[in-house]
Amino acid sequence: FHMYDANYAISVLIFVVVAAIVSTLMVKLQRQMQLANKKREITSKINEIGNGFLNVSGFDEIKKYSEESLANLTGKRVTVLLKENQKERFTNELAEWCYNQSLPCGHGECQFPNDTGLYIPIKNREKTYGVIVFDCQDWSLREEEKVYVDTVISQITLVIEREQLSREK
């Protein structure tokens, strides 16, 4: 391969550099598109969950629907423990501690970090209604998943408050 003009060599070099830049930008764009699609999918799931809560009544239905929804959202095994009255006690001591302290505990948290379960209270500013237990055998909730779970928890608290108001009538 022999070039007669140095301008051809410079042109080829410029084309190679431009091709590398375009390729890098395309890879970044593809990653951003994948991320946007994933966020859209999760937002859609959260909206679906919220719509499903509109048709739920009774603590047993709330518990069952919450477990199914969180399991679909995270892809992990989830148990929801609700207290209909303050005198009840959970049989699980860590769940009881989480409920009483209104703090997360278990896997990856400051309190009881060696446990395989992650215990997250279902609460609003004034009151705790129950505990969500994630089975964290061989995995952890990522920060972005915690945000989605917190969104669902706020929906659960609204449904529980609605249920309690309807019982008081």
Which residues does each PLM region occupy?
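Short acidic-hydrophobic sequence patches enriched in Asp/Glu that either
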Residues: 5-8, 41, 90, 148
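GAF sensory domains
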Residues: 48-159
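Signal-transmission/dimerization alpha-helices at domain junctions
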Residues: 15-28, 125, 148-169
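Transmembrane alpha-helices and immediately adjacent membrane-cytoplasm interface residues
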Residues: 1-33
